[in-house]
């Protein structure tokens, strides 16, 4: 299977390089990676991928891809749609790795391609021009489909929409953390900020219940605890 990854930034590289994807992104990011390889670290592992494991290309590579993974920012989605329309075959499945619920709907509304859901459980931070550190461990979750059957190190699931609803609940902590101006551990050690997060989560769960939206936990703790 030929896999192309559109949006080879920090998250895209953290996922696409271990997958053996053809990477499509900005030259300033990809040039040092192509020349010297990529180091990926997390709390438990330290992996190095040499230059021979890095494949880069322009958007024309989408034409021969059997699966296209999208890992851009959500704000770049209009440009992504234009690029896919211009270069990809209309039947090639698109795997959306973007945060939020709307990217999958927007891609499906704009493209004839099958649109698959994916979810990345970690963040990736640059520790140098060719070194990415992952904030946590965990497998990328992808929709169970014949196009994702050979992707390595993933969790194939039939409940991706419910999982994305759960990830949205998990992400509610991010704006509160930004407002606090504290490191996450320090914020969670403060009862006032914990109560604010709990109130936000309670309101979100009420909205889900009223809308009849199913969700499954996207982290180690169920949101209703």
Q: What is the predicted role of each segment?
A:
Residues 1-46:
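NAD(P)+-binding Rossmann beta1-loop-alpha1 motif at the extreme N-terminus of oxidoreductases
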Residues 5, 23-24, 70-71, 96-97, ...:
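Active-site-adjacent beta-strand anchor residues
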Residues 181-196:
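Active-site lid/adjacent beta-loop-alpha segment flanking the redox-cofactor pocket in flavoenzymes
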Residues 1, 19-21, 65-68, 90-94, ...:
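Short active-site oxyanion
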Residues 193-225:
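Small-residue-rich helix-loop
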Residues 47-133:
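Rossmann-like NAD(P)(H) cofactor-binding subdomain of soluble oxidoreductases
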Residues 12, 146-147, 165, 193-201:
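Generic structural signal for well-ordered, non-membrane alpha-helical segments
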Residues 99-182:
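Rossmann-fold dinucleotide-binding core
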């Amino acid at each position: 299977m030929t896999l192309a990854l559109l949006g080879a930034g920090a998250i895209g590289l953290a996922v696409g390089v271990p997958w053996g994807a053809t990477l499509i992104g900005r030259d300033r990011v990809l040039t040092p990676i192509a020349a010297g390889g990529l180091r990926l670290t997390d709390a438990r592992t330290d992996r190095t991928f040499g230059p021979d494991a890095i494949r880069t290309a322009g958007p024309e590579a989408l034409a021969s891809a059997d699966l296209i993974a999208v890992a851009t920012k959500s704000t770049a989605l209009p440009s992504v749609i234009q690029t896919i329309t211009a270069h990809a075959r209309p039947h090639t499945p698109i795997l959306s790795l973007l945060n939020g619920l709307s990217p999958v709907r927007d891609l499906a509304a704009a493209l004839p391609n099958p649109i698959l859901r994916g979810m990345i459980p970690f963040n990736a931070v640059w520790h140098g021009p060719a070194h990415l550190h992952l904030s946590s461990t965990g497998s990328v979750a992808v929709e169970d489909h014949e196009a994702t059957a050979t992707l390595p190190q993933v969790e194939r699931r039939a409940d991706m929409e419910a999982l994305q609803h759960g990830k949205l609940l998990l992400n509610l902590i991010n704006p509160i953390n930004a407002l606090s101006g504290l490191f996450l551990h320090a914020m969670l050690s403060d009862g006032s900020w914990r109560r604010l997060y709990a109130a936000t989560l309670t309101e979100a769960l009420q909205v889900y219940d009223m809308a009849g939206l199913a969700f499954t936990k996207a982290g180690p703790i169920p949101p209703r605890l």
